[in-house]
């Protein structure tokens, strides 16, 4: 299966390093947009391993990154017809209001062109509130074919009740998702 990534990277050594890593993973870089602006920067996050009983923690430093400035007019129009499955995470929607708007428009355009929409409800409380996340992702669900959502996110952020099987079946019944995958942490 040929896969590609849609992203925007700074036009500098760091951006080229990331592009080369993408290529090394046998992922097409045809849809990488390069940011030539003086403000160009790569978004990063820092991971600190936890030591029991303290959990691991993540610090996101993605504000004002090149990716956050991605706009629809930077993408070739043929991308929508060429794509069979478009996968996106809710983290993308949480990074920046303008990027959220762009990502939602991309979901609609891929859906209209006949692509399957694969969506990972990867909720991160450090990026946005449960209320905003719930409102945003529930508006996207009607377009989603393949849904990835944890039991914890379903119960807490999305306020679903019932057995895990009932909750997952509810996504299919309510929104028409054809495949729902979940994780259960013990």
Q: Which residues does each predicted region cover?
A:
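Conserved phosphate/ATP/ADP-binding segment of small-molecule kinases
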Residues: 113, 127-186
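Anion (oxyanion) recognition and catalysis
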Residues: 23, 108-112, 141
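Histidine-anchored nucleotide/phosphate-binding helix
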Residues: 1, 103-109
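Conserved N-terminal subdomain of the carbohydrate kinase-like
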Residues: 5-90
């Amino acid at each position: 299966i040929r896969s590609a990534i849609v992203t925007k990277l700074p036009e500098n050594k760091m951006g080229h390093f990331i592009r080369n890593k993408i290529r090394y993973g046998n992922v097409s870089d045809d849809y990488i947009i390069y940011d030539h602006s003086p403000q160009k920067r790569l978004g990063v996050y820092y991971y600190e391993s936890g030591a029991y009983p303290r959990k691991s923690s993540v610090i996101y430093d993605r504000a004002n990154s090149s990716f956050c400035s991605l706009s629809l007019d930077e993408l070739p129009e043929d991308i929508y017809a060429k794509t069979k499955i478009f996968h996106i995470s809710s983290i993308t929607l949480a990074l920046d209001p303008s990027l959220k708007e762009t990502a939602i428009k991309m979901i609609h355009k891929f859906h209209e062109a006949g692509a399957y929409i694969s969506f990972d409800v990867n909720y991160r409380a450090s990026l946005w509130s449960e209320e905003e996340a719930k409102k945003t992702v529930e508006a996207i669900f009607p377009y989603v074919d393949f849904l990835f959502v944890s039991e914890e996110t379903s119960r807490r952020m999305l306020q679903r009740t019932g057995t895990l099987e009932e909750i997952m079946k509810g996504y299919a019944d309510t929104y028409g998702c054809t495949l729902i995958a979940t994780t259960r942490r013990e």
